[in-house]
Amino acid sequence: MNTNDYPEKAFLLSGLSECGKSTAGMYFDSIGIKRMKLVKVLAYKEMKKNKNINPYEYAVELAKEKGEIFVAQKFIDNLTDICNRENTRYCSVESLIYRRNAEYIKSKMPDRFIITYIDMPEKERLKRQMIRSRVDIEEAKKIMLPRDKIKMSHGAHEIKNIADVVINNEGSLEELYSQLLKMSKKYCKLE
Protein backbone atom coordinates (compact mmCIF):
# COMPACT_ATOMS: atom_id res chain seq x y z
CA MET A 1 0.00 0.00 0.00
CA ASN A 2 1.25 3.45 -0.88
CA THR A 3 1.76 5.63 2.19
CA ASN A 4 -0.14 8.46 0.46
CA ASP A 5 -3.34 6.43 0.36
CA TYR A 6 -6.38 7.63 2.25
CA PRO A 7 -7.68 7.48 4.86
CA GLU A 8 -4.94 9.14 6.83
CA LYS A 9 -6.89 8.29 9.99
CA ALA A 10 -10.05 6.25 10.52
CA PHE A 11 -11.73 6.07 13.91
CA LEU A 12 -13.30 2.62 14.20
CA LEU A 13 -16.10 3.03 16.73
CA SER A 14 -16.93 0.12 18.99
CA GLY A 15 -19.02 -0.50 22.10
CA LEU A 16 -22.20 -2.16 23.23
CA SER A 17 -25.76 -1.12 22.32
CA GLU A 18 -26.78 2.48 23.02
CA CYS A 19 -23.28 3.50 24.17
CA GLY A 20 -23.05 6.50 21.83
CA LYS A 21 -21.34 5.19 18.68
CA SER A 22 -23.82 6.93 16.37
CA THR A 23 -23.67 10.12 18.42
CA ALA A 24 -19.88 10.05 18.11
CA GLY A 25 -20.11 9.41 14.37
CA MET A 26 -22.51 12.33 13.89
CA TYR A 27 -20.28 14.62 15.93
CA PHE A 28 -17.21 13.63 13.93
CA ASP A 29 -19.16 14.29 10.72
CA SER A 30 -20.05 17.78 11.99
CA ILE A 31 -16.35 18.68 12.36
CA GLY A 32 -15.23 17.32 8.99
CA ILE A 33 -14.53 13.67 9.77
CA LYS A 34 -16.75 11.69 7.39
CA ARG A 35 -19.21 9.29 9.05
CA MET A 36 -19.47 5.80 7.58
CA LYS A 37 -21.11 2.49 8.46
CA LEU A 38 -18.96 -0.63 8.50
CA VAL A 39 -21.55 -2.85 6.81
CA LYS A 40 -21.99 -0.33 3.98
CA VAL A 41 -18.23 -0.15 3.50
CA LEU A 42 -18.15 -3.96 3.29
CA ALA A 43 -20.99 -4.04 0.75
CA TYR A 44 -19.76 -0.98 -1.16
CA LYS A 45 -18.97 -2.68 -4.48
CA GLU A 46 -21.97 -5.01 -4.31
CA MET A 47 -24.31 -2.07 -3.59
CA LYS A 48 -23.05 -0.30 -6.73
CA LYS A 49 -24.10 -3.35 -8.78
CA ASN A 50 -27.35 -4.07 -6.95
CA LYS A 51 -29.13 -1.16 -5.24
CA ASN A 52 -31.51 -3.55 -3.44
CA ILE A 53 -28.82 -5.37 -1.48
CA ASN A 54 -29.18 -5.26 2.32
CA PRO A 55 -25.70 -4.37 3.62
CA TYR A 56 -26.38 -5.89 7.07
CA GLU A 57 -27.44 -9.24 5.63
CA TYR A 58 -24.53 -9.13 3.19
CA ALA A 59 -22.01 -8.57 6.01
CA VAL A 60 -23.42 -11.42 8.11
CA GLU A 61 -23.40 -13.84 5.17
CA LEU A 62 -19.90 -12.80 4.15
CA ALA A 63 -18.61 -13.48 7.67
CA LYS A 64 -20.32 -16.89 7.71
CA GLU A 65 -19.03 -17.88 4.27
CA LYS A 66 -15.52 -16.42 4.27
CA GLY A 67 -14.63 -15.86 7.93
CA GLU A 68 -13.78 -12.83 10.02
CA ILE A 69 -10.25 -12.30 8.69
CA PHE A 70 -11.47 -12.20 5.09
CA VAL A 71 -14.13 -9.68 6.16
CA ALA A 72 -11.54 -7.53 7.96
CA GLN A 73 -9.26 -7.43 4.91
CA LYS A 74 -12.19 -6.66 2.59
CA PHE A 75 -13.14 -3.82 4.93
CA ILE A 76 -9.60 -2.38 4.79
CA ASP A 77 -9.51 -2.69 0.98
CA ASN A 78 -12.97 -1.17 0.47
CA LEU A 79 -12.44 1.68 2.94
CA THR A 80 -9.13 2.56 1.30
CA ASP A 81 -10.80 2.47 -2.12
CA ILE A 82 -13.74 4.65 -1.01
CA CYS A 83 -11.51 7.20 0.73
CA ASN A 84 -9.14 7.44 -2.25
CA ARG A 85 -12.02 7.86 -4.72
CA GLU A 86 -13.64 10.54 -2.56
CA ASN A 87 -10.42 12.17 -1.30
CA THR A 88 -11.47 11.46 2.28
CA ARG A 89 -8.57 12.07 4.65
CA TYR A 90 -10.41 11.32 7.89
CA CYS A 91 -13.43 9.17 8.68
CA SER A 92 -15.23 7.44 11.51
CA VAL A 93 -16.75 4.01 10.99
CA GLU A 94 -19.56 2.45 13.02
CA SER A 95 -19.77 -0.27 14.37
CA LEU A 96 -16.83 -2.55 14.98
CA ILE A 97 -18.17 -5.52 16.98
CA TYR A 98 -15.94 -8.46 16.03
CA ARG A 99 -12.89 -8.69 18.32
CA ARG A 100 -10.92 -10.73 15.76
CA ASN A 101 -11.60 -8.10 13.08
CA ALA A 102 -10.35 -5.40 15.44
CA GLU A 103 -7.17 -7.35 16.17
CA TYR A 104 -6.51 -8.00 12.49
CA ILE A 105 -7.13 -4.40 11.43
CA LYS A 106 -4.94 -3.11 14.25
CA SER A 107 -2.13 -5.47 13.22
CA LYS A 108 -2.30 -4.42 9.56
CA MET A 109 -2.62 -0.64 9.85
CA PRO A 110 -1.96 0.51 13.42
CA ASP A 111 -0.92 3.99 12.31
CA ARG A 112 -4.11 4.70 10.35
CA PHE A 113 -6.90 2.91 12.17
CA ILE A 114 -7.72 4.21 15.64
CA ILE A 115 -9.83 1.64 17.45
CA THR A 116 -12.15 3.64 19.68
CA TYR A 117 -14.25 1.93 22.34
CA ILE A 118 -17.14 3.93 23.76
CA ASP A 119 -17.85 2.75 27.28
CA MET A 120 -21.11 3.36 29.12
CA PRO A 121 -22.62 1.42 32.04
CA GLU A 122 -25.59 -0.82 31.28
CA LYS A 123 -28.01 1.22 33.41
CA GLU A 124 -27.17 4.37 31.45
CA ARG A 125 -27.52 2.55 28.14
CA LEU A 126 -30.91 1.22 29.26
CA LYS A 127 -32.02 4.78 30.02
CA ARG A 128 -31.06 5.76 26.49
CA GLN A 129 -33.01 2.79 25.10
CA MET A 130 -36.06 3.82 27.15
CA ILE A 131 -35.92 7.34 25.72
CA ARG A 132 -35.24 6.21 22.15
CA SER A 133 -38.02 3.60 22.12
CA ARG A 134 -40.39 5.39 24.51
CA VAL A 135 -40.74 2.31 26.70
CA ASP A 136 -40.34 1.35 30.36
CA ILE A 137 -37.24 -0.31 31.79
CA GLU A 138 -38.51 -3.88 31.26
CA GLU A 139 -39.28 -3.26 27.60
CA ALA A 140 -35.92 -1.52 27.18
CA LYS A 141 -34.20 -4.63 28.56
CA LYS A 142 -36.10 -6.82 26.08
CA ILE A 143 -34.89 -4.62 23.22
CA MET A 144 -31.30 -3.90 24.24
CA LEU A 145 -30.02 -6.93 26.14
CA PRO A 146 -30.46 -9.42 23.25
CA ARG A 147 -28.52 -7.02 21.00
CA ASP A 148 -25.78 -6.83 23.64
CA LYS A 149 -25.71 -10.62 23.83
CA ILE A 150 -25.09 -10.88 20.09
CA LYS A 151 -22.36 -8.24 20.19
CA MET A 152 -20.73 -9.93 23.18
CA SER A 153 -20.80 -13.31 21.42
CA HIS A 154 -18.51 -11.71 18.81
CA GLY A 155 -16.25 -10.22 21.48
CA ALA A 156 -17.39 -6.59 21.20
CA HIS A 157 -16.89 -6.01 24.93
CA GLU A 158 -13.30 -7.33 24.65
CA ILE A 159 -12.39 -4.68 22.07
CA LYS A 160 -12.09 -2.30 25.03
CA ASN A 161 -8.91 -4.18 26.03
CA ILE A 162 -7.17 -3.56 22.69
CA ALA A 163 -8.61 -0.14 21.87
CA ASP A 164 -6.30 2.76 21.14
CA VAL A 165 -8.79 5.07 22.84
CA VAL A 166 -11.47 4.32 25.44
CA ILE A 167 -14.10 7.03 25.79
CA ASN A 168 -16.03 7.19 29.05
CA ASN A 169 -19.54 8.21 28.03
CA GLU A 170 -21.11 8.40 31.48
CA GLY A 171 -21.32 12.19 31.49
CA SER A 172 -23.14 14.81 29.50
CA LEU A 173 -23.28 15.18 25.74
CA GLU A 174 -20.92 18.16 26.05
CA GLU A 175 -18.40 15.97 27.90
CA LEU A 176 -18.58 13.37 25.13
CA TYR A 177 -18.08 16.05 22.48
CA SER A 178 -15.11 17.42 24.42
CA GLN A 179 -13.44 13.99 24.49
CA LEU A 180 -14.10 13.48 20.78
CA LEU A 181 -12.75 16.93 19.89
CA LYS A 182 -9.60 16.30 21.93
CA MET A 183 -9.15 12.96 20.17
CA SER A 184 -9.67 14.47 16.72
CA LYS A 185 -7.08 17.18 17.44
CA LYS A 186 -4.59 14.54 18.56
CA TYR A 187 -4.94 12.39 15.42
CA CYS A 188 -6.13 14.75 12.65
CA LYS A 189 -5.07 18.02 11.07
CA LEU A 190 -8.50 19.55 10.55
CA GLU A 191 -8.80 22.88 8.73
PLM region descriptions:
Residues S30-R35, I115, D164-V166:
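Conserved beta-strand scaffold positions in the cores of enzyme catalytic domains, especially
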Residues N2-E8:
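Phosphate-binding P-loop
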Residues F11-L12:
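Short hydrophobic/aromatic beta-strand immediately N-terminal to the Walker A/P-loop
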Residues E94-L96, M109-S133:
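Conserved phosphate-donor/acceptor-positioning beta-strand/loop module used by diverse small-molecule
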Residues I69-F70, I131-K186:
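Small-molecule kinase domains that catalyze NTP-dependent phosphoryl transfer to phosphate-bearing small molecules
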